[in-house]
Amino acid sequence: MSRIRFVQLNHLRPSQQRGAAAVEFALVLIPLLALAFGIVEFGRTIYHYDAVVKSVRAASRLIAAYDPSDSVSFSSAATQARCIAVFGKTSCQSGDTPLAPGLATSHVKICTRASVAECPDLQIADVQNVSTGTGTGTVQLVVVRIDGYQFGFLGLPFTGVGTSVQFNTISSVMRGI
């Protein structure tokens, strides 16, 4: 009967195994860094999306305080609302930094029943407030939205992965005066 012989797999001396852990660490570090960068970039995207949503809400809150039938004051308020939506303040200067990179006042659309040209896909009507019986009459709705905004990623240059994502339409509807 033959005897079974066990072969020792770890036949290298410790002095010959130096650096093996460093090589393994380097091989694992590359995907871990890419994963960490992706997580940070995803968080950055969510942060900018939230900033844009809040600025649109603030712009609609401002424009809702003006009567759309008064074209002079409403036009001035619309300009201020566009500045709030993009820059976070009521006045725009040429050197101002937008809240999100690439955001411009041309992305902001302000729509009311009287001015539907900027939002042809919306049907805005005054809402008759008859259910309460208080006699408050009609309620004017104001819509502020951002269309076509593309958020640019920092990106990993060697991957060739997409460098931007287009956000869906971000809108806020408020009850006007």
Where are the language model's segments positioned?
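Short, conserved structural patches
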Residues: 2-7, 57-177
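Alpha-helical assembly-interface signal, strongest on the long, hydrophobic N-terminal helix that forms
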Residues: 2-86
